[in-house]
């Protein structure tokens, strides 16, 4: 699987992953809205969206 693995306002980068899914997590704190992307589907994070196709977590 190929997933995006960059955060918020950093340039888009991708990674070839062993996992069969990608995730995108969005949350807000005193720094503003933070978006994190990566491989797999970590269930410990809140407000996470998982998907199962290449480049699906932009």
Swiss-Prot record:
GO molecular function: acetylcholine receptor inhibitor activity; ion channel regulator activity; toxin activity
Protein's cellular compartments: Secreted
Disulfide bridge partners, by residue number: 3-22, 17-39, 41-50, 51-56
One Pfam family in the UniProt entry: Toxin_cobra-type
Keyword field: Acetylcholine receptor inhibiting toxin, Disulfide bond, Ion channel impairing toxin, Neurotoxin, Postsynaptic neurotoxin, Secreted, Toxin
Tissue distribution: Expressed by the venom gland.
Chief place of localization: secreted
Annotated GO CC locations: extracellular region
Family: Belongs to the three-finger toxin family. Short-chain subfamily. Type I alpha-neurotoxin sub-subfamily.
Protein role: Binds to muscle nicotinic acetylcholine receptor (nAChR) and inhibit acetylcholine from binding to the receptor, thereby impairing neuromuscular transmission.
Entry protein name: Toxin S5C10
Organism: Dendroaspis jamesoni kaimosae (Eastern Jameson's mamba)
Phylogenetic lineage: Eukaryota, Metazoa, Chordata, Craniata, Vertebrata
